[in-house]
Amino acid sequence: MNHKINISCKLSVVAVLFSLTGCTRDINTDVLATYPNLSDVFIDEFASDLQYQAWGKVTNFGVDTETTYDGTSSMRIEVPNPSDPMGSWAGGTFYSATGRNLSGYDALTFYAKSSVATAIEVGIGNYDTTEYLVQVNDVQLNTNWSKIIIPIPNSAKLLSEKGLFYYSAGAVNDEGYTIWFDEVKFEKLGTLAHAKIEDIEVPGFPGKLTIGT
């Protein structure tokens, strides 16, 4: 009698496992893996999924409601002088807490200016992983607003990208200064030729581009 009971229990367990396995097969994994394709990073305020991580002087970032390219506010970066005890440079990364599908875009664009003539580094893909890092060195800024375009190579691979925008800047002539960023967003420009090599020159682009392919 005990033998028959044991067999019956085992068969019941097998039946339950088979039933659960059948249910699992009905789940659409493509739906589960879908990430939002939001374009905005900062348009007067942080996008809904946006987080910030400071580098260098941790208090370098703020929101400015007086100096803007368009709208009601901009990002303000206070670059410290080299002797600042809280940090000798300013940097930070803006990232998505969940990840975004950027496959439909070919560039990150924004407007920028500085209180003095300077050169900074900007890019995308510098959070959690740098597999698809796009780094632009020597971006020239001055007191006038300029539109900056960061081309995105291989955007079809960016299905769950977290690193949306980063910046890095140091003092000029041992003095601190201010940088502003505004209207930071991803766009589909359709006019960019994405070379898959490093340190390339892009016509009309103010800087040296390093692409991770």
Model-derived features: where do they sit?
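Beta-rich carbohydrate-recognition modules and glycan-binding surfaces
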Residues: C23-T213
